[in-house]
């Protein structure tokens, strides 16, 4: 369990620190280009969830994310699985969720600043930006979710297979 909270704390600290730096350096600027036509830092405030979609009022989002985070921590705590493949994804999702929840509680919105500029332009007469501006917490949640999918069979072994092998 210490490994879980250590990893989650690292995500939260990195997320909050980079957001503070983004506010200090980027808030008054348009963007800072790191790799032309690909990667830049652009300050943005997000009232919604993924891709800026507004899902619910701030208070509901805080309650929802807080509940999900608590359930993740309880699930990890109650599980006997202490492998890296189990702990790492859940710690990333938990840390990312808490990092963004801190923003919602303290400022009412999430600070985003990493901008992968894949394509901005017209598609079928509509202006689109094909990649959202995001932050460290969003990255941790996404990576954690991908790891859960990737390692699903080792994290959650099929119980019916175990029961069948126990009978023989």
UniProtKB/Swiss-Prot annotation:
What subcellular compartments does it reside in? Cell inner membrane
Q: Does the keyword Transmembrane apply?
A: yes
Pathway linked to the protein: Protein modification; lipoprotein biosynthesis (signal peptide cleavage)
Q: Which keywords describe this protein according to UniProt? A: Aspartyl protease, Cell inner membrane, Cell membrane, Hydrolase, Membrane, Protease, Transmembrane, Transmembrane helix
Q: What is its EC number?
A: 3.4.23.36
Q: Please provide the Gene Ontology terms (biological process) for this protein.
A: proteolysis
Q: Which reaction does it catalyse?
A: Release of signal peptides from bacterial membrane prolipoproteins. Hydrolyzes -Xaa-Yaa-Zaa-|-(S,diacylglyceryl)Cys-, in which Xaa is hydrophobic (preferably Leu), and Yaa (Ala or Ser) and Zaa (Gly or Ala) have small, neutral side chains
NCBIfam families in alphabetical order: lspA, PRK14787.1
The family assignment reads: Belongs to the peptidase A8 family.
This one is known as Lipoprotein signal peptidase
């Amino acid at each position: 369990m210490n490994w879980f909270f250590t990893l989650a704390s690292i995500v939260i600290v990195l997320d909050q620190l980079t957001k503070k730096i983004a506010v200090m350096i980027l808030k008054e600027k348009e963007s800072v280009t790191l790799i032309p036509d690909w990667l830049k830092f652009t300050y943005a405030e997000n009232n919604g969830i993924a891709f800026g979609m507004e899902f619910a009022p701030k208070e509901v989002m805080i309650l929802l994310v807080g509940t999900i985070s608590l359930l993740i921590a309880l699930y990890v705590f109650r599980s006997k699985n202490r492998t890296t493949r189990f702990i790492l994804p859940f710690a990333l999702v938990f840390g990312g969720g808490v990092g963004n929840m801190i923003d919602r509680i303290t400022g009412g919105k999430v600070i985003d600043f990493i901008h992968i500029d894949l394509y901005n332009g017209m598609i079928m007469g509509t202006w689109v930006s094909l990649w959202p501006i995001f932050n460290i917490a969003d990255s941790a949640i996404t990576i954690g979710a991908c790891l859960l999918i990737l390692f699903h069979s080792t994290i959650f072994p099929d119980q019916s297979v175990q029961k069948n092998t126990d009978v023989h």
